[in-house]
């Protein structure tokens, strides 16, 4: 049987230390960070992606598909200057990513998997419960002791309420002894899982382990379009969902910080192995940035 689930979400202001937030993340697998994005940034970002979101049709499938009455948009870095110049430059985000993925002397241990606006429309059904690490199917076989494969900074762009489909989280599920497919009837917890809604104001986010069971809630309203920004980050050894370095114009890439260029695949991540320096996503043993004509990095990231 699974251990008792704490019926709460720990919450911290964005001014809290990364160590405090990370300790709660380790304990529960998910934690709310209040004010992760400023109100001004949220307003500008939402306005900048509005034109693209309006062009996306609303699908009504009624078949359990995760796109049922849910819009998704993954070109935030192109559509939003606020996103690429401010939101992804959060030092707190990178401090937490370092604690999850990076090791001393091994450089930047992570990059973006996806950046997605997710807008749950009125009447959208609840999403099936799942773990994000199931994107990489073998990861569940390692159980709770396995390394983190993916984390998500899931940011509220509009208010998250229980009525409009706030994400349902299962704190503590990252420590369950068995990581079986939770929607299968042979799962010991099938039909018995207690979820907690992530109630948030615009600018708040929850940081979630890829091991945590969760799913979007049912939007029972007739008017609310529950909009979120998902910043999904994976360990550098894994292939991302989005081919950013092939789809983002070089003009925009040149304007990014070295850190963001690495996050999107315009720079290699460097690992020191014994006496060698290994480039992940490199070119002929060198940093891919040289091939792309970018300036040499001031430090190895």
Curated annotation (Swiss-Prot):
Under the heading InterPro entries, the entry gives: Phytyl_CoA_dOase-like
Metabolic or biological pathway = Secondary metabolite biosynthesis; terpenoid biosynthesis
Q: Where is this site: Important for reaction specificity?
A: 150, 232
> Would you kindly state one Gene Ontology biological process term found in this protein's UniProt entry?
paraherquonin biosynthetic process
Q: Which reaction does it catalyse?
A: preaustinoid A1 + 2-oxoglutarate + O2 = berkeleyone B + succinate + CO2 + H2O; berkeleyone B + 2-oxoglutarate + O2 = berkeleydione + succinate + CO2 + H2O; preaustinoid A + 2 2-oxoglutarate + 2 O2 = berkeleytrione + 2 succinate + 2 CO2 + H2O
Q: What is its EC number?
A: 1.14.11.-
Transmembrane regions = none
Instruction: Cite the entry's keywords alphabetically.
Output: Dioxygenase, Iron, Metal-binding, Oxidoreductase
The cofactor(s) it depends on are:
Fe cation
A GO MF annotation of the entry reads:
dioxygenase activity
Residues binding Fe cation: 130, 132, 214
Q: What does this protein do?
A: Multifunctional dioxygenase; part of the gene cluster that mediates the biosynthesis of paraherquonin, a meroterpenoid with a unique, highly congested hexacyclic molecular architecture. The first step of the pathway is the synthesis of 3,5-dimethylorsellinic acid (DMOA) by the polyketide synthase prhL.
Relay the domain remarks. Residues at positions 150 and 232 are important for type of reaction catalyzed, using identical substrate. Both ausE and prhA accept preaustinoid A1 as a substrate to form divergent products through dynamic skeletal rearrangement.
Protein family (similarity comment): Belongs to the PhyH family.
Q: Describe the protein's quaternary organization and the partners it interacts with.
A: Homodimer.
Designated name of the protein:
Multifunctional dioxygenase prhA
């Amino acid at each position: 049987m699974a251990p008792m689930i704490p019926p709460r979400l720990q919450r911290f202001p964005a001014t809290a230390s990364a160590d405090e937030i990370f300790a709660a993340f380790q304990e529960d697998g998910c934690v709310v960070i209040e004010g992760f994005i400023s109100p001004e940034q949220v307003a500008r970002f939402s306005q900048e992606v509005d034109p693209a979101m309006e062009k996306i049709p609303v699908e009504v499938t009624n078949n359990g598909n995760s796109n049922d009455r849910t819009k998704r948009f993954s070109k935030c870095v192109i559509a939003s200057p606020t996103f690429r110049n401010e939101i992804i430059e959060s030092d707190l985000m990178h401090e937490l990513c370092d604690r999850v993925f990076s090791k001393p002397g091994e450089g930047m241990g992570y990059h973006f998997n996806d950046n997605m606006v997710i807008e749950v429309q009125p009447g959208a059904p609840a999403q099936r419960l799942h773990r994000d690490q199931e994107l990489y199917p073998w990861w569940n076989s390692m159980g709770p002791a396995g390394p983190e494969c993916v984390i998500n900074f899931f940011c509220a762009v509009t208010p998250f309420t229980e009525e409009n489909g706030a994400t349902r989280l299962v704190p503590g599920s990252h420590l369950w002894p068995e990581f079986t497919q939770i929607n299968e009837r042979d799962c010991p917890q099938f039909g018995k899982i207690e979820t907690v809604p992530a109630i948030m104001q615009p600018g708040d986010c929850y940081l979630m382990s890829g091991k945590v069971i969760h799913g979007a809630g049912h939007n029972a309203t007739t008017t609310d379009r529950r909009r979120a920004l998902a910043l999904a980050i994976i360990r550098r050894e894994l292939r991302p969902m989005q081919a950013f370095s092939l789809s983002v114009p070089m003009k925009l890439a040149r304007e990014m910080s070295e850190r963001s260029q690495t996050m999107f695949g315009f720079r290699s991540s460097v690992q020191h192995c014994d006496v060698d320096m290994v480039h992940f996503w490199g070119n002929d043993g060198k940093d891919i940035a040289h091939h792309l004509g970018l300036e040499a990095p001031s430090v190895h990231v």
